[in-house]
């Protein structure tokens, strides 16, 4: 339910809770409950009010209210007054029974509509009625119910019922499963279709609740007949809304039906049959597009950017009379405040946002944030008299504030709350009121006053020196104004003002009780002399204001001017749209407007109750401004926009609906409903007739068919050289396409549209750099001052925060973010107050508004608790420098005292669910690992790898359930390399995965875990490690089973020109594909792969024995996970993936260029697009981190002048005509296929014990985009595979022998050494006899080859602990259970069998007579069997006899076997020796 009052005024009241002239008749009434809705009937004194689920009515303008008797026993949730039938209103309840009146509430009738009841399970919406302006009997009532989450989406189910007799009879359910339905005649000016026609959007969902198809349906008989309406070039998006505004029917469609934040397309029609796609060139996201008061000849659309939590900005667009072509009228509209002036065509008021002139440190009050003073930018108010084409500042009629001096009036609000339930400027002939201040921009709340204008908003006078809520009566000749507060801001107002001379003078009236005013109501047309002041009166308790009561003041000006009614001489003719007395009125829509209004000083009342203001039209002479482009043409992008050029898409559509083969169209036409006077001129004086042959516009693939490339490029020139950039999100549900960048000029820039445009961050301090956090939207700018600037909305708004300690050169990372809470972060700086500049760590829990000291001496800190499987949200680890200059690790958990964990550490790393600490002990480097933040275990390295204190190690990855770590074994300058280690699942035992892995001098390693594919790793090794001298000779190695086995990439047979490589035919060790790795990348974010483009890899390298120089490389592509490759371009290129791999983009990295190379068909073909009119030096090619966008950014510099950064936005959004069809219920009928990764040496598709299938776009469906289609939901494992060698890796202290692929003990170690090393650990009580193999944690294989069988054994002297751990110790109660209970059961069972099966069948003597060589007891033994129990017992007896005979026979036979034969069998089965240090498994 929307709150009907001015929200700012209400919040002002809430803020306080936290803290002998003519006199009209005033009447006070109080109530316990505030209304949630209040509204007038049109041309009536009757008001409906909803309070606490009860309906109230007043027949006398609010003087008295009484509860509606018909609904007393009902739970009323809302009401709607018919906008077209003045006497009718509908009241909705939470049941299926509702009410309506046809006489303004004098009587009420029931009607039933079996839509969703609000009492049912799930979230049901408040019912809503769709009215028909052409036939009041045709109505639709509907609501919707959403799944348990309650969040509105396409998954919500709508239910529609209709009536053809105004609900006098039972309504009928609409037989259309629609998402939205609208009457074609839901606007009085609409002549679309038939009176009974409805348009509905129907979404077809599959079992996954995905939209498979979205269709526009028209029905002229409420669904009995349904006709599909074709939206021209609509692709396959999802219709989200249908609007009928003025004479336009618009259909709003998401381009990406799987994204709630998709770009929006709008289709417009005036006849309901032919739809044209609007050219609204802006990324519009659902929920941020609104339709403003439109004229008969144009649409006004506002798009609002909600990326900032505190500073929403909007754009205002105006369409031509076709509703297709749009012009941007105003940008950067602050808080979306733009409003058309009532009754005056072409007059608008708007607030614009401009950068602040300074970083003022003055504190804003709470009311400042509510009233605009807390806005992130300065607010400047402007007006337009020419329908938005030009905008000007508001003049103050005071010599102290002149426009020439940059002084003008700026209004925070210029609207009143109408009795219709919406905010308007007021139904007056040019008389306006506003709340604001004067100066260069809107001031603080304490500077705000109330102003009045008598010329439609061009000039203003100071009316009251305090902000007021206002309302107009008697056509603007009575103005009511109630201050927001009393003398003090925290006190209620106990008086109000009124003016009887259009705001020139004011009288003050005292009130019986002070109130915080909410709004002032009067009749819809503003002709009444009665007002209702609605407010609240706080009640004081022991702790201040505790609750509030509703206070109403009924104010009646019935006897004003002694009852005198104005005569003709009391009126004047006023002309609208005149900026001043000397200027001519502006012509809009071909006419000037005049009004007869009362003279300001006349002492009389107009007293024309319910009579709307009349406009006197004065036609203007026709000019070019009265003409616009005809359908089939569009405004030229060159010049002033007056020239019209052919629109191929529109011409194609016109040809499709025309029977003629030739179209003859004027390039311009008179604006619809334009009233200009042609005089002696003709249309040909303004327009030119053009002819088009339809045959030329219907050729498939022809440029004129609308299939031309729709790549859009936007250049931004940014001062300074690019030094840092990053993509950031705005919230968790939105695409992270905000871009923040810093330049060498120490300035920061922000883009909130994916790089299409950039704005400088209005910070005057030098910006040293920025950090982005793990929570979407976190950005912190560091400066050279005592302030930092914090944003939580992707840089849309930065708030200044004072740093608790200054930046220090010894602190490499001054900020540490919390993983999940954006308000928590740690600041580390130097406290120089005592002269020693000691490092100190502080923490904040409120986004930097305040800080508390965390630890003195800390140089690094991290929130680590959230990474563990059982999170400790406030757990922090800090590295502290001790007095001896050694480093120690400390743990701090919330308010607890710091606890030292380790002395003499090198550092720590947080990866996955692990924290790894490097500790120096006994001159060697040891690793400690924790998975819970409390208990640390030793990380045991292979026995042949001794890590000295000076050796470095790098923690690389842990996404596959194991830690990958690189330990440096050669730190010689320019010849650094080391051993790649991999841990078991808890990070305690490490084995050698790959030796001699390349690293650089700062510790970065040539190691890449490929996103999107399990266990695929690429690393570069130093092949000439034995030479121990530079230069390195690198080779690329790939593992497809998570580091267990390594091999070479198979090279492509030919290069990009079709020429065979020289080494073709040589073994892979001499001829393989080698790629430049992590250590050589200019930007470490440029990875081989993308998590969304499954199986796609791009890299720069060469084919040969070794990796050659970077500048001599070529660019290679694989689309099958690296199994096969092809060279796509000769030379070094930057690369990016777009739209989950449907767009592959390359741009030259070494050579100056003006073109981008792209492929839309998985690299089969490549196209070149020129993005610049001159060649530039490209710095980087970028897109969103998820690679799901269809926008790219090229950062470049002019080769001749690198002092500024050139940013090119390359937008492929419109290059695809449709979105790929995804239907997981019918996968054979959509645009996708399943793809499985394979091993080059495997005969099946089993990897890690299962066959996985990933969904990818069909290779031949290159005409569609993927967007946000949830392809991950389609991932499946179709079968579990038997275990093979590839499912195992070497166990601890074992290493793979590449010659025979077996795991052998590390050199110099025996099985006994392994036992010794494991048992020597503190508190160790067991060791394991290993086969040398362990199962890879990622593998899910079952059965097959089992290579990892091992058995735990007790360490010497630890048998007791071993038994206790495995529950093998026998004592006490366990001994009783193990011995006594089985004995009792056995004795009882034996007695029972003897009694029922042996004793009564003759005893043991009888059994002894049975021959054991017969298959049955046919010798006459017939046991007694009276029931089933006897049968079971006798079978046990028989079976016992047979088993006994078998045992005896076996023992006799064993005696005959020669003992030598047993020895031979044992040797054959077990081998000649039982001592082994490897297991030979030839099977791969």
Curated annotation (Swiss-Prot):
Bilayer topology = Single-pass type I membrane protein
Please indicate the ranges of residues that lie on the Cytoplasmic side.
Answer: 1396-1484
**Segments annotated as BNR repeats:** 99-110, 383-392, 451-461, 497-508, 749-758, 842-852, 1116-1126, 1157-1167
CDD domains attached to this UniProt entry = Sialidase_non-viral (cd15482)
Can you cite an annotated GO cellular component? membrane
SUPFAM superfamilies recorded = Oligoxyloglucan reducing end-specific cellobiohydrolase
The protein in question is named Vacuolar protein sorting/targeting protein 10
Source organism per entry reads Lodderomyces elongisporus (strain ATCC 11503 / CBS 2605 / JCM 1781 / NBRC 1676 / NRRL YB-4239) (Yeast)
């Amino acid at each position: 339910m929307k709150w009907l009052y001015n929200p700012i005024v209400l919040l002002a009241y809430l803020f306080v809770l936290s803290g002998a002239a003519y006199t009209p008749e005033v009447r006070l009434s109080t109530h316990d409950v505030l209304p949630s809705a209040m509204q007038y009937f049109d041309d009536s004194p009757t008001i409906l009010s909803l309070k606490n689920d009860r309906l109230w009515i007043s027949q006398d303008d609010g003087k008295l209210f009484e509860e509606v008797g018909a609904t007393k026993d009902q739970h009323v949730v809302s009401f709607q007054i018919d906008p077209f039938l003045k006497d009718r209103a509908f009241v909705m309840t939470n049941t299926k029974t509702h009410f309506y009146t046809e006489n303004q509430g004098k009587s009420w009738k029931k009607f039933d509509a079996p839509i969703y009841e609000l009492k049912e399970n799930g979230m049901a919406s408040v019912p809503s009625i769709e009215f028909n302006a052409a036939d009041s009997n045709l109505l639709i009532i509907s609501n919707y119910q959403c799944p348990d989450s309650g969040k509105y989406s396409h998954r919500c189910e709508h239910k529609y019922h209709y009536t053809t007799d105004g609900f006098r009879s039972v309504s009928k359910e609409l037989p259309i499963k629609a998402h939205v339905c609208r009457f074609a005649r839901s606007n009085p000016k609409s002549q679309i279709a038939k009176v009974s026609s409805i348009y509905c959007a129907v979404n077809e969902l599959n079992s996954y609740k995905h939209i498979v198809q979205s269709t526009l349906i028209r029905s002229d008989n409420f669904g009995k007949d349904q006709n599909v309406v074709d939206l021209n070039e609509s692709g396959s998006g999802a219709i989200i809304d249908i609007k009928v505004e003025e004479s336009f029917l618009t259909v709003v469609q998401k381009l990406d039906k799987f994204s709630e934040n998709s770009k929006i397309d709008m289709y417009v029609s005036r006849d309901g049959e032919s739809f044209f796609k609007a050219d609204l060139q802006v990324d519009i996201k659902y929920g941020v597009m609104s339709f403003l008061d439109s004229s008969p000849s144009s649409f006004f659309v506002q798009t609002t950017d909600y990326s900032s939590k505190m500073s929403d900005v909007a754009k205002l667009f105006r369409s031509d009379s076709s509703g297709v072509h749009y012009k941007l009228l105003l940008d950067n509209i602050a808080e979306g405040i733009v409003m058309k002036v009532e009754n005056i065509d072409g007059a608008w008021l708007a607030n614009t946002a401009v950068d602040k002139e300074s970083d003022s440190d003055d504190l804003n009050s709470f009311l400042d944030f509510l009233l605009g003073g807390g806005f992130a930018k300065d607010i400047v108010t402007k007006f337009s008299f020419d329908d938005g084409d030009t905008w000007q500042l508001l003049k103050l009629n005071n010599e102290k504030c002149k426009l020439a001096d940059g002084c003008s009036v700026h209004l925070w609000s210029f609207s009143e709350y109408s009795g219709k339930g919406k905010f308007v400027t007021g139904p007056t002939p040019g008389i306006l009121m506003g709340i604001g201040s004067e100066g260069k921009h809107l001031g603080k709340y304490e500077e705000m006053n109330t102003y009045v204008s008598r010329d439609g908003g061009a000039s203003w006078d100071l009316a009251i020196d305090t902000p007021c809520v206002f309302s107009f009566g008697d056509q603007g000749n009575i103005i009511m104004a109630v201050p927001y507060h009393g003398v003090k801001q925290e006190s209620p107002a106990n008086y109000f003002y009124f003016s009887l001379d259009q705001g020139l003078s004011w009288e003050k009236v005292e009130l019986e009780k002070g109130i915080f005013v909410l709004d002032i109501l009067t009749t819809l047309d503003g002709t009444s002399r009665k007002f209702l002041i609605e407010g609240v009166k706080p009640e004081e308790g022991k702790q201040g204001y505790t609750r509030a009561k509703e206070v109403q003041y009924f104010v009646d000006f019935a006897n004003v001017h002694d009852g005198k009614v104005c005569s003709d001489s009391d009126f004047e003719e006023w002309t609208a749209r005149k900026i001043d007395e000397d200027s001519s009125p502006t012509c809009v829509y071909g006419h000037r407007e005049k009004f007869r209004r009362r003279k300001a000083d006349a002492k009389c009342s107009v007293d024309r109750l319910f009579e709307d203001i009349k406009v006197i039209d004065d036609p203007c002479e026709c000019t070019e401004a009265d003409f616009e482009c005809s359908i089939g043409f569009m405004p030229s992008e060159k010049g002033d926009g007056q020239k019209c050029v052919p629109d191929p898409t529109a011409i194609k559509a016109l040809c499709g609906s025309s029977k003629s083969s030739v179209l003859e169209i004027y390039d311009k036409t008179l604006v619809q409903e334009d009233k200009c006077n042609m005089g002696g001129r003709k249309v040909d004086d303004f327009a030119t007739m053009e002819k088009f042959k339809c045959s030329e516009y219907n050729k498939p693939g022809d440029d004129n068919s609308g299939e031309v490339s729709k790549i859009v490029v936007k250049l931004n020139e940014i001062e300074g050289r690019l030094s840092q950039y990053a993509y950031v999100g705005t919230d968790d549900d939105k695409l992270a396409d905000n871009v923040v960048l810093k330049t060498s000029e120490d300035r920061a820039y922000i883009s909130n549209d994916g790089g299409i445009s950039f704005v400088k961050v209005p910070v005057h301090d030098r910006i040293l750099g920025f950090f982005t956090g793990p929570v979407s939207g976190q950005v912190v700018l560091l400066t050279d001052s005592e302030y930092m600037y914090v944003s939580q909305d992707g840089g849309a708004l930065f708030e200044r925060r004072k740093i608790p300690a200054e930046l220090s050169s010894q602190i490499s990372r001054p900020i540490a973010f919390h993983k999940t809470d954006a308000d928590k972060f740690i600041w580390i700086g130097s406290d120089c107050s005592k002269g020693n500049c000691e490092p100190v760590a502080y923490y904040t829990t409120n986004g930097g508004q305040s800080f508390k000291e965390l630890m003195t001496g800390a140089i690094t800190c991290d929130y680590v608790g959230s990474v563990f499987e059982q999170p400790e949200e406030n757990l922090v680890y800090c590295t502290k420098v001790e007095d001896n200059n050694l480093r120690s690790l400390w743990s701090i958990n919330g308010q607890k005292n710091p606890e030292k964990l380790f002395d003499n550490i090198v550092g720590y790393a947080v990866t996955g669910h692990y924290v790894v600490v490097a500790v120096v002990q006994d001159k060697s480097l040891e690793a400690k690992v924790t998975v819970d933040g409390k208990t640390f275990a030793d990380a045991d390295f292979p026995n042949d790898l001794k890590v000295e204190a000076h050796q470095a190690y790098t923690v690389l990855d842990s996404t596959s359930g194991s830690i990958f770590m690189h330990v440096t074994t050669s730190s010689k300058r320019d010849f650094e390399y080391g051993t790649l280690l991999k841990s078991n699942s808890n990070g305690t035992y490490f084995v050698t995965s790959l030796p001699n892995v390349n690293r650089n001098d700062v510790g970065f390693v040539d190691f890449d875990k490929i996103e999107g594919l399990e266990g695929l790793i690429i690393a570069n090794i130093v092949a000439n490690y034995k030479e121990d001298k530079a230069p390195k000779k690198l080779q690329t190695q790939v593992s497809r089973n998570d580091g267990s086995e390594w091999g070479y990439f198979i090279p492509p047979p030919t290069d990009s020109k079709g020429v065979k490589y020289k080494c073709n035919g040589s073994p892979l060790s001499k001829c393989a594909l080698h790629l430049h790795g992590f250590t050589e990348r200019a930007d470490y974010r440029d990875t081989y792969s993308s998590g969304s483009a499954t199986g796609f890899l791009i890299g720069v390298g060469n084919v040969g024995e070794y990796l050659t120089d970077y500048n001599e490389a070529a660019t290679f592509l694989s689309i099958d996970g690296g199994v096969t490759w092809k060279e796509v371009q000769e030379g070094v290129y930057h690369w990016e993936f777009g739209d989950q791999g449907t767009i592959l983009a390359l741009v030259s990295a070494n050579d100056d260029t003006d073109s981008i190379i792209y492929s839309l068909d998985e690299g089969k073909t490549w196209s070149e697009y020129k993005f610049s009119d001159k060649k530039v030096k490209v710095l980087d090619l970028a897109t969103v981190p998820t690679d799901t966008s269809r926008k790219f950014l090229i950062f470049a510099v002019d080769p001749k002048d690198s002092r500024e950064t050139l940013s090119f936005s390359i937008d492929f959004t419109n290059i695809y005509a449709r979105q790929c069809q995804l239907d997981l219920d019918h996968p054979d009928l959509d645009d996708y296929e399943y793809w499985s990764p394979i091993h080059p040496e495997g005969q099946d598709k089993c990897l890690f014990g299962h066959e996985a299938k990933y969904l990818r776009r069909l290779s031949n469906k290159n005409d569609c985009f993927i967007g946000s289609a949830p392809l991950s939901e389609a991932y499946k494992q179709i079968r579990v595979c038997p275990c093979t060698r590839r499912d195992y890796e070497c166990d601890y202290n074992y290493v793979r022998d590449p010659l025979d692929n077996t795991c052998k003990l590390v050199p110099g170690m025996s099985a006994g050494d392994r036992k010794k090393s494991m048992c020597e650990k503190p508190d160790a009580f067991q060791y394991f006899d290993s086969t040398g193999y362990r199962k890879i944690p990622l593998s899910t294989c079952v059965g097959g080859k089992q290579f990892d069988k091992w058995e735990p054994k007790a360490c010497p002297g630890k048998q007791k602990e071993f038994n206790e751990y495995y529950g093998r110790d026998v004592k006490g109660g366990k001994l009783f259970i193990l011995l006594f209970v089985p004995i009792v059961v056995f004795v009882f069972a034996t007695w029972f069998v003897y009694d029922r099966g042996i004793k009564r069948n003759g005893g043991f003597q009888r059994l002894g007579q049975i021959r054991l060589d017969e298959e049955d007891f046919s010798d006459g033994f017939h046991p007694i069997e009276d029931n089933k129990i006897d049968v079971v017992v006798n079978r046990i007896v028989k079976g016992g006899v047979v088993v006994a005979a078998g045992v005896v026979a076996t023992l006799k036979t064993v005696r005959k076997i020669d003992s030598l034969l047993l020895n031979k069998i044992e040797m054959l089965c077990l081998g000649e020796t039982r001592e082994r240090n490897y297991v030979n498994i030839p099977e791969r």
